[in-house]
Design a protein with these regions (language model features):
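Conserved PLP-binding catalytic core of the aspartate aminotransferase-like
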Residues: 154-163, 168-203, 213, 217-218, ...
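Amphipathic, non-transmembrane alpha-helical secondary structure
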Residues: 8-19, 48, 140, 144, ...
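PLP-dependent enzyme catalytic core of the Aspartate aminotransferase-like
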Residues: 201-204, 213-251
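Short, small-residue-enriched loops and turns at beta-alpha junctions
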Residues: 8-9, 36-41, 68-71, 125-126, ...
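Active-site C-terminal subdomain of aminotransferase-like
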Residues: 57-60, 67, 72-178, 190
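Active-site phosphate-binding strand-loop segment of PLP-dependent enzymes
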Residues: 3-63
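Alpha-helical structural signal in soluble globular domains
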Residues: 14-17, 46-56, 82, 88, ...
Length: 251
């Protein structure tokens, strides 16, 4: 069953449908699967409500937290920690390719019996090579940095707030959010692509996204802030957006 994105009412409808299967005996297992952060929009899944519905219907909760582990939550443990529901999530999945250093590989974390089952039945795991020791060591070091200090996380969110404020002052339309992914909305796919190209000529690399990656008529340039960015970097990016917009508008 598929439920509408972040729509708790529709999720309830789908859970009720699952419970009605097999002459009312319900599905053998029910798992609610969601991203922790939706990467094209930068907004967070309503995890408290999802966990409440899981409790009501006896479902498990699985969260793909690829865009949150490392900087969301008090200790960087991700979206469930941010919402205070870590103990109500049964299965975490994620990647080592984003906040944890940009390397390859990923993980599944959960109860021992679930992980043991996946070791035997998870086809991507069964038919994949092991991670290189260098990647494992780099990821462990990144986790130590995340757990050891909140300074980088604080810098990241200051940078995101500064970028949002400055872009708003320059008249750009942004999606609301509290994440370091900041979508700058243009609507028209060709327009977003031309502005991204114009910015690259100024040395600022951004990526335009359009349908079918995002809904029709909601083309955007997705910006991902980093704790490594300085205020000067952010001001330069804002200036490049302004110059790119002006250049495209002038033809």
């Amino acid at each position: 069953f598929r439920y509408r994105n972040a729509d708790l009412a529709d999720l309830r409808t789908q859970l009720e449908a699952a419970a009605a299967l097999n002459d009312g005996q319900g599905a053998r297992r029910t798992v609610i699967v969601t991203d922790g952060v939706f990467s094209m929009d930068g907004y967070l899944a309503p995890l408290p409500g999802i966990c409440d519905l899981a409790d009501e219907f006896g479902a498990l909760v699985m969260v793909d937290d690829s865009h949150a582990v490392g900087f969301m939550g008090e200790t960087g443990a991700g979206t469930p920690e941010h919402f205070g529901v870590s103990d109500r999530v049964d299965l975490y999945t994620g990647t080592f390719g984003k906040a944890l250093g940009g390397a390859s590989g990923g993980y599944v974390s959960g109860r021992r019996e679930i992980v043991a089952m996946l070791r035997q039945k998870g086809r991507p795991y069964l038919f994949s090579n092991s991670l290189a020791p260098s990647i494992t060591a780099a990821t462990l070091t990144a986790l130590e940095l995340v757990e050891g200090s909140a300074e980088l996380r604080a810098t990241l969110f200051r940078n995101a707030e500064l970028f949002r404020r400055r872009m708003g002052e320059e008249g750009f339309e942004l999606l609301d959010g509290e994440h370091a992914i900041v979508p700058v909305m243009f609507g028209d796919a060709a327009l977003a692509g031309r502005i991204a190209d114009a910015m690259l000529e100024q040395g600022v690399y951004v990526t335009a996204f359009s349908y079918p990656v995002v809904p029709q008529g909601q083309a955007r340039i997705r910006v991902q802030l980093s704790a490594a960015h300085s205020e000067e970097d952010i001001e330069a990016a804002v200036a490049a957006f302004v110059a790119g917009r002006d250049a495209v508008q002038q033809g």
